[in-house]
Amino acid sequence: MIQMQSILEVADNSGAKKVMCIKVLGGSHHMVAKLGDVIVVSVKEAIPGGKVKKGDVYKGVIVRTKTGVVRPDGSTIKFDKNALVLLNKQDEPIGTRVFGPVTRELRAKKYVRIMSLAEEVL
């Protein structure tokens, strides 16, 4: 579960390395974000020459969490780190590649484009 002030890694090649959550979208009582939720983030670390700069504010969709997700068959998928993919104003991925695995739960949230860019879908 991701809340305000959480530090996440960026799983795409947009140029950002680490971001901090500054707002969880989805209503006034939405305090934590889970897999597939959209949050507003600020870039804390970026590589030189990337598409994004340090201090920029973007939306991002969460693709991996430490708390994981429980599937209807009872299995649980957890990851070592929290990660997201940065989105532009039209809610499309900024990067052209997604590093690491993503989960099938993104399909229900209408993020098929991220699934097609990913190396592996669990």
From Swiss-Prot:
Q: Pfam families attached here?
A: Ribosomal_L14 (PF00238)
CC annotations in GO: cytosolic large ribosomal subunit
* Membrane-spanning parts: none
Q: Which Gene3D superfamilies match?
A: Ribosomal protein L14 (2.40.150.20)
Q: Which UniProt keywords apply?
A: Ribonucleoprotein, Ribosomal protein, RNA-binding, rRNA-binding
| InterPro entries given in the database record | Ribosomal_uL14 (IPR000218), Ribosomal_uL14_bac-type (IPR005745), Ribosomal_uL14_CS (IPR019972), Ribosomal_uL14_sf (IPR036853)
Q: What Gene Ontology terms describe what this protein does at the molecular function level?
A: large ribosomal subunit rRNA binding; structural constituent of ribosome
Biological processes annotated in GO? translation
Q: Which cysteines are joined by disulfide bonds?
A: none
Function description? Binds to 23S rRNA. Forms part of two intersubunit bridges in the 70S ribosome.
Matches recorded under NCBIfam families: rplN_bact
User: Which HAMAP family does the entry mention?
Assistant: Ribosomal_uL14
| Family classification | Belongs to the universal ribosomal protein uL14 family.
Under the subunit heading, UniProt states: Part of the 50S ribosomal subunit. Forms a cluster with proteins L3 and L19. In the 70S ribosome, L14 and L19 interact and together make contacts with the 16S rRNA in bridges B5 and B8.
> What is the protein name for this chain?
Large ribosomal subunit protein uL14
